[in-house]
Amino acid sequence: MIRKIIKALWIFLAVIVLAIVIVFVSISKGWIGYMPPVEELENPSYKFATEIFSEDEKVLGTWSYSKENRVYTAYKDLSPSIINALIATEDVRFVEHSGIDAKALFRAFVKRGLMFQKNAGGGSTLSQQLAKQLFTENVARNTLQRLFQKPIEWVIAVKLERYYTKEEILSMYLNKFDFLNNAVGIKTAAYTYFGCEPKDLKIEEAATLVGMCKNPSLYNPVRFNERSRGRRNVVLEQMRKAGYITDAECDSLQALPLKLTYNRVDHKEGLATYFREYLRGVMTAPKPVRSDYRGWQMQKFYEDSIAWETNPLYGWCAKNKKKDGTNYNIYTDGLKIYTTINSRMQQYAEDAVKEHLGDYLQPIFFKEKEGSKNAPYARSLPEKRVEELLTKAMKQTERYRLMKEAGASEQQIRKAFDTPEEMTVFSWKGDKDTIMTPMDSIRYYKSFLRTGFMSMDPANGHVKAYVGGPNYVYFQYDMAMVGRRQVGSTIKPYLYTLAMENGFSPCDQARHVEQTLIDENGTPWTPRNANDKRYGEMVTLKWGLANSDNWISAYLMGKLNPYDLVRLIHSFGVRNKAIDPVVSLCLGPCEISVGEMVSAYTAFANKGIRVAPLFVTRIEDSDGNVISTFAPQMEEVISASSTYKMLVMLRAVINEGTGGRVRRYGITADMGGKTGTTNDNSDAWFMGFTPSLVSGCLVGGDERDIHFGRMTYGQGAAAALPIWAMYMKKVYDDPTLGYDQQERFKLPEGFDPCAGSETPDGEVIEEGGLDDLFN
């Protein structure tokens, strides 16, 4: 009887062993479940975010899909603390086993399978956990499914150990794990929770992150600080048991509070948000096809077509192929994009915008509109027109679109927009919670002044700073490169350049009186002037530009051809085809972007050579191989002699004219510039340049009818110039950037900007004028 029992047990055991062998062979061959092929095991599919770097190699941000914001980190870049904490907590015999820890597996089987102890710990090794993350996409929903899934993980874990070193497995695990809050992978997690690189993680910080590996939602340190701290202390205790830290270290670290340096990873936040979004749009642009554009988008089709042919960065993803023949994907291919943005200069630009626009100008604008039924629109605008504009804005909202699609009537929609509700809104002092109607929120957001700012190196086109608006989260329309506004008097340097190219000089004179020209319709046109000082006197062209005098501009326009002026403006890199060749063009009614203006003004600082904005210097793949480089694009647009004459006059704008306010900010540098203000103070401009930097700034409302009522605050010298000056002062005050206020423009020896001019005896050359220009 006993022999029969023993024989039966042996047969039963043999059947079990045979069944196990058959199961594992079947799994290994792929007959049961999914077994990845060798190629997939050797090269598991990872989706890595693209990193955008500044020129000083600071990470500006990343591009990724929402659940794949992962940045690759090599083993050598990991802190020993994170490795020790992970091994001590998750797989203490990691270096000893080959994918399956028999001791841990047996312990788990006995305590959990036979004794039903839920807190007995698991038997999964790090290799098995990695196998689960990499190749078992369908998570088991019950115990039975888990029983079938476990053997598959065991086989994959053994194969992973065969193909990879222990260090590679640890690195893969930490790169793959999702630490929540859009922090996938150890590099993003280290920055998100502690504001540092993985190699700089302290022991207690590493323990916090490893503690999340058990259950990231349960031990989320942002939501559950104390619970996460408790889990961190468990990890520290495991490190003590494993001998990685001493008893004293463990006790002192466990006593520490859990302190986070939380940095929310969001493409809408951080430094240079408008720049990053503009760059993303440029790189992912498809090849322009006319049928994809509506009738009113022909200007965009024209610009996109030129960019596709001339700009290697435009449509980069569509133009470049990977080794497997597919196009690059900026969201998953782990690219490294090295931009021309300087992180400190970018910060200075954003700080200047906040200090002047947010802290000073915006409160004044709010106060001016206080009590006005038309607010934020001009008081002179009819109430009916204000209502039309607000209704139009309402119909452009996502709320309106969704309600319309749901079948709501106009009356129902309007009622919803007039019903107060809780909401979080933007303010320059930080987001604030309030209660207002959606309609009032439209008025509220339209009350904020917008801005565009760009700064670039005239020698190579490197864009150093780029600000497209007050806050990208709430104001996503880019006023730096995308939006175009009327330029006002900042167009006058183009007019004067055309005059210099046609033989005029800064010392040529005109009588300072009203000028009447015949416009394209045969109608007399007489521009208004800001003032009548020196009325009836003979004044130089230099005086006319320095004082932004409309009569002298009209005088020159009468001597020149508006068609030639349009051609010259286009030659300066302006691509707006809707610039009409009319006599009033000399006062700047046309619309140009800040980026186009900055690029155009580089010609004045660069001996007549205009340089296009350069945003990226090189792109590397995930392995660090350089796959694209980018060079400056330059073009001579005016002669060097005309450039020197323009330098004389544009410098006078600062030293003697409308741009003199710059000097109040401690800017002593040799520079030229031009202010600009459009009708009703709708747009305020300042363009300024030194030998090493060309920068431009625009300030205006969301619409042309939203503006200051008084020129005191709405003119270019008051609204835009201070941002430029504050930025430059910060740049000059930072010696590490290498910009020097002692730098001077260089003229050819013996150059006479007034050669050939018939300035009569007795003409007064303004103080600080031609004779001592470059001393």
PLM features: what roles do these ranges have?
Residues 95-105, 184-187, 246-251, 500-521, ...:
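Short, well-structured active-site flanking segments
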Residues 85-87, 239, 349, 460-461, ...:
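Active-site SXXK
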